[in-house]
């Protein structure tokens, strides 16, 4: 996989579109590990394939608000 990412949708994206996007992640071989559905924050965390990641980067600003790597932050 390309790695673990947190994908946050824009506020006006429909529930159907979000569900469809998550289904695509799974169909392409990725996994959904967490879902966020709060006012002002709709999205999911999961492992994305390089194919899904590239596609989502292309949707940024349109459907997707942000894509962040879901890494463990360590401080020295």
Swiss-Prot record:
Q: Which domain of life is it from?
A: Eukaryota
What GO terms describe the biological role, i.e. biological process, of this protein?
Answer: vacuole fusion, non-autophagic
N-acetylserine-modified residues are 1
Protein purpose: Specifically inhibits an endogenous intracellular serine proteinase (proteinase A).
Which InterPro entries has this protein been placed in?
Answer: PBI_I9, S8pro/Inhibitor_I9_sf
UniProt-recorded Gene Ontology molecular function terms: serine-type endopeptidase inhibitor activity
Protein name (Swiss-Prot/TrEMBL): Serine proteinase inhibitor IA-1
Keywords assigned: Acetylation, Protease inhibitor, Serine protease inhibitor
Q: Which family does it belong to?
A: Belongs to the protease inhibitor I9 family.
């Amino acid at each position: 996989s390309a790695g673990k990412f947190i994908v946050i949708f824009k506020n006006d994206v429909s529930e159907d579109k979000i569900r469809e996007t998550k289904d695509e992640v799974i169909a392409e071989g990725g996994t959904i590990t967490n879902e966020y559905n709060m006012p002002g924050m709709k999205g999911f965390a999961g492992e994305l394939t390089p194919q899904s990641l590239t596609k989502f980067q292309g949707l940024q600003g349109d459907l997707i608000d942000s894509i962040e790597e879901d890494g463990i932050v360590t401080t020295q």
